[in-house]
């Protein structure tokens, strides 16, 4: 059964999703009105690589002579605005789409893009979860489903770069991928990295685990250098120093919770210790300290996927 945290997160996502709005019998006009004021802002990062900010997860973009690749697609009512931002960069319409994971603020535009012939790619579990849905998320329509899936990863040789897509197991969910432009030295981390806007959300009901979040941060840190541009799932652009600080936060909170669990302390007692207090500084954050500590606590009660994380 989904945890209260995951249900809350899903409810917030669905509050803005077209599927939920349809389920509530709201009109298409009302759906669009929710996003009428959203602007898609593009920031070039390297030759043929950009990030798009709007509502929902940050979007990565590769464009050039071999076609346009979108990394995540936010919400369905924003598809035309996203395509407009792509056009304004001088790029062709989207040809390929990679989903970093299955959540609706990263896959909400899948159906629109799929219906235009865009080739959708994602990790195996993303397709599985989109097909099944859950208590808060209806099953996705066929056009929204990835048609190319992978277990460990895939490489795209496009637009003068090698784009390496790698699965990070049991982290934010069980289907997270990072996308690394080798030549451009840009990496999109999806929701493996929330940069300065909230404490991390770990979707336990979708196979996520705090240990995997830490392992993913360590893996990416081993790949990057001081010049790497890092696209987080949410928040502003980041660099290696930002990711180090994020990794250290994860390590500190996980370590404190694990130590307290070993001493027999309950969840409430550990929350009262406020092990995430120094990072719980945004009053508007989606995930606050107690919710994050709860997710870490429950993660540590689950089997350790250390061997998976090492691969």
PLM regions with names:
Residues 40-86, 179-181, 186-189:
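Conserved beta-strand hairpin/beta-sheet module of binuclear metal-dependent hydrolase folds
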Residues 48, 62, 72, 86, ...:
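Divalent metal-coordination and catalytic microenvironments
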Residues 42, 65-69, 77-121:
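Active-site metal-binding motif and surrounding structural segment of the metallo-beta-lactamase
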Residues 18-21:
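Bacterial Sec-type N-terminal signal peptides, specifically the leucine/valine-rich hydrophobic h-region
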Residues 27-30, 44, 67-68, 75-77, 126-169, 173-174, ...:
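Metallo-beta-lactamase
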Residues 12, 23-32, 222-227, 236-311:
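Accessory terminal helices/loops
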Residues 1-12:
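Bacterial N-terminal signal peptides that target proteins for export
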């Amino acid at each position: 059964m989904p945890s209260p945290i995951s249900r809350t997160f899903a409810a917030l996502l669905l509050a803005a999703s077209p599927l939920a709005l349809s389920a509530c019998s709201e009109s298409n006009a009302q759906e669009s009105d929710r996003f009428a004021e959203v602007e898609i802002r593009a920031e070039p990062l390297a030759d043929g690589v950009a990030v798009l900010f709007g509502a929902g997860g940050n979007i990565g973009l590769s464009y050039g002579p071999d076609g346009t690749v979108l990394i995540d697609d936010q919400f369905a009512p924003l598809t035309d605005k996203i395509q407009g931002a792509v056009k304004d960069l001088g790029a062709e319409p989207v040809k390929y789409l990679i989903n970093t994971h299955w959540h609706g603020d990263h896959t909400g535009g899948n159906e629109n893009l799929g219906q235009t012939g865009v080739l959708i790619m994602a990790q195996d579990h993303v397709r599985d979860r989109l097909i099944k849905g859950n208590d808060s998320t209806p099953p996705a329509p066929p056009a929204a489903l990835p048609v190319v899936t992978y277990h460990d990863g895939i490489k795209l040789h496009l637009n003068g770069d090698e784009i390496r897509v790698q699965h990070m197991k049991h982290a934010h969910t069980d289907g997270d991928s990072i996308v690394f432009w080798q030549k451009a030295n840009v990496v999109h981390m999806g929701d493996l990295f929330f940069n300065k806007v909230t404490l991390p959300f770990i979707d336990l009901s979708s196979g996520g685990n705090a240990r995997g979040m830490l392992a993913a941060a360590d893996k990416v840190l081993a790949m990057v250098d001081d010049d790497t541009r890092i696209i987080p799932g949410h928040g502003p652009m980041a660099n290696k120093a930002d990711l180090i600080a994020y990794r250290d936060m994860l390590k500190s909170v996980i370590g404190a919770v694990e130590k307290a669990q070993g001493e027999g302390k309950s969840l409430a007692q550990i929350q009262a210790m406020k092990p995430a207090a120094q990072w719980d500084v945004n009053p508007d954050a989606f995930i606050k300290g107690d919710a994050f500590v709860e997710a870490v606590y429950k993660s540590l009660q689950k089997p350790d996927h250390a061997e998976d994380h090492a691969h």
